[in-house]
């Protein structure tokens, strides 16, 4: 649940390119606060973007690609020279709530402060307390590689004026406590919209198309609203919770950046929080209509069917039913029926391996076909699975596949 616009790979960037400020308070937080902060840090998927070297977790240095150039994630360890070791609690709160560095400069919105602004002060400081327990690692990040004039941070003040609305999440008194907890996570800490909401030409969320899906690192982060084919209309609350907790359900499997989100974040969440997210997502109504799917040509469907029967039926079966929670079913698959075919193309080209989580330890894999199929053949077989068995989605072209190979 990665980003387009300012938001880079993985569902999820906390960018602290900072200078030192006032010293950290010496008081040791209680163990329960640190444990809470660890859980919140996992829910925010901070490690995915702030870990370039697995041997140096949270030390930053990972390059985040944006349409405007590269940005490097910062060091969240308590190193005093290159990390957060000299930050005060107030420095950390201002960064999370307002996107402002200790020296007063603005962060770029690749760091999802437009979402983190919704967190309570207690939760922000619990995250801070947990990060302070990490082993300090000296690791200086390269400067951002943004093109002129975006390399001037002062311009972010204009961006904030136009698009940023700070403020803690306000519960809806007409909704249940569970729905409000889900909203707090979806809209705030988990920052789902950072990947699943399309962006405008300046990298800000298109509010007229909230959760309508967006391209992230060559994959399509699908709709999270109630759209019939490409959204969650056919998923129950339990389906959504199972997917977030395990990376799979009876409808689909997590692949690409979303697989990392499940591995590093949602699979670590409590059952209660996963269920709360599912309750909230299930009530999101489509903000933008699904595009009508024109039936592909009979020739392309016939060619795609031949390829499918030759390469796919051993695992996915002739009727596309697959194997429960090992090889995903293809009929009714929302990822397949997304208006944008990027994810389906990527899986055929690169193959896939089902992630394993404590809730779903068994695995399955699919070989890559990039070297075995031409661009047209990939387009044909993807078009076929997107339109067979009652599915409906736009046809895929060889040009789209060629672009995905680059």
Language-model regions, residue ranges each:
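N-terminal secretory signal peptides that target proteins for export/translocation
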Residues: 1-7
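Bacterial N-terminal signal peptides
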Residues: 9-20
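Boundary at the C-terminal end of the N-terminal hydrophobic targeting segment
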Residues: 23-27
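Flexible coil segments in periplasmic/lumen-exposed cytochrome c-class electron-transfer proteins
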Residues: 31-32, 43, 51-70, 102-183, ...
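Aromatic- and charge-enriched surface segment that lines or borders ligand/interaction sites
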Residues: 84-100, 104, 126, 233-237
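C-terminal structural cap/anchor segments
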Residues: 305-343
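C-terminal lobe and pocket-closing loops
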Residues: 337-342, 352-360
């Amino acid at each position: 649940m990665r980003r387009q616009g300012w938001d880079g790979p993985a569902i999820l960037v906390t960018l602290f390119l900072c200078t030192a400020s006032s010293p950290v308070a010496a008081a040791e937080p209680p163990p329960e606060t640190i444990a809470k902060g660890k859980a919140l840090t996992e829910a925010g998927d901070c490690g995915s973007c702030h870990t370039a070297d697995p041997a140096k977790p949270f030390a930053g240095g990972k390059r985040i690609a944006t349409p405007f150039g590269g940005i490097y994630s910062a060091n969240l360890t308590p190193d005093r020279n290159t990390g957060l070791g000299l930050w005060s609690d107030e420095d950390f709160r201002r960064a999370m709530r307002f996107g402002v560095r200790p020296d007063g400069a603005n962060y770029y919105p690749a760091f999802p402060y437009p979402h983190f602004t919704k967190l309570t002060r207690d939760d922000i400081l619990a995250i801070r307390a947990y990060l302070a327990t990490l082993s300090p690692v000296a690791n200086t990040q390269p400067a951002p590689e943004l093109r002129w004039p975006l390399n001037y941070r002062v311009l972010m003040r204009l961006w904030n004026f136009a698009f940023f609305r700070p403020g803690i999440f306000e519960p809806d008194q007409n909704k249940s406590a569970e729905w409000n907890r889900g909203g707090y996570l979806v809209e705030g800490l988990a920052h789902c919209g950072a990947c699943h909401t399309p962006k405008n030409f300046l990298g800000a969320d298109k509010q007229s198309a909230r959760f309508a899906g967006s391209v992230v690192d060559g994959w399509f982060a699908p709709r999270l609203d109630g759209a019939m084919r490409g959204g969650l209309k056919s998923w129950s609350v339990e389906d959504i919770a199972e997917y977030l907790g395990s990376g799979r359900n009876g409808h689909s499997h997590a692949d690409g950046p979303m697989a990392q989100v499940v591995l590093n974040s949602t699979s670590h969440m409590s059952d209660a929080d996963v269920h709360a997210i599912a309750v909230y997502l299930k009530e999101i109504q489509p903000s933008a209509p699904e595009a009508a799917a024109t039936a592909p040509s009979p020739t392309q469907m016939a060619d795609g069917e031949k390829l499918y029967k030759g390469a796919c039926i051993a695992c996915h079966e002739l009727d596309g039913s697959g194997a429960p929670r090992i090889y995903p079913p293809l009929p009714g698959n929302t990822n397949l029926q997304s208006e944008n075919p990027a994810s389906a193309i990527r899986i055929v080209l690169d193959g896939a391996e089902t992630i394993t989580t404590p809730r779903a330890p068994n695995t399955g894999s699919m070989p890559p076909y990039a070297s075995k199929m031409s661009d047209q053949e990939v387009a044909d077989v993807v078009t076929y699975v997107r339109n067979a068995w009652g599915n409906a989605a736009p046809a895929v072209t060889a040009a789209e596949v060629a672009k995905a190979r680059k």
